[in-house]
């Protein structure tokens, strides 16, 4: 590499290119075409005997079933000294059941060609699943097992805590994350739960115990 060996040029001089010829005048705005039609699917509603409300859309193009189960809760049920508890709980629900280790649970889900994810928000904790229609009952059985018979393994709990703290430290180095967290505090106030990071903070997450999750 020889410094200064490059050719000199004037950046103010713009190159000229021959324009591609057109069969019409591009300076004239074309007429609008027909308004596109949008077919909005019908949403059906139902209620179970236990009071659960169901909202659904039918689509027979592919043999798949996708469903979300929302449970009232999430960040708004936390206390200020336990920020991030809902997120830790949701993450730990994916880490095995009373009858299955993490690996066994993952294998059971994969054998069905399904995916099951649990995440928490401000007002709800949501279990989201996608599966083949023929495996719907088996997938739903796994969801039930994850919710009602969680493993709550201490080693997995420690790993989830460490991963969450690592994410929080990454956010501290991200201008977008810092801006988002600061914006929420300014909008809702420092004493309002909605102004807090859904993951909590490094101090609060470190103080959460497995008994808090249970």
Positions of PLM-derived features:
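M16 family metallopeptidases and their MPP-like homologs
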Residues: 1-4, 55-57, 61-149, 165-169, ...
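Proteolytic maturation boundary segments
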Residues: 1-72
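Hydrophobic pocket-lining residues within nucleotide cofactor-binding pockets
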Residues: 12-15, 131, 208
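Short N-terminal helix-initiation segments at or just after the protein's N-terminus
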Residues: 16, 30-34, 162-177
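Histidine-acidic residue clusters that define the catalytic metal-binding segment
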Residues: 28-45, 185-214
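Hydrophobic/aromatic residues in well-formed alpha-helices
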Residues: 51, 105, 139, 157-160, ...
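Alpha-helix N-capping/helix-start residues
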Residues: 99, 154, 207-210
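Surface-exposed patches in mature extracellular/periplasmic domains of secreted proteins
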Residues: 117-119, 152-159
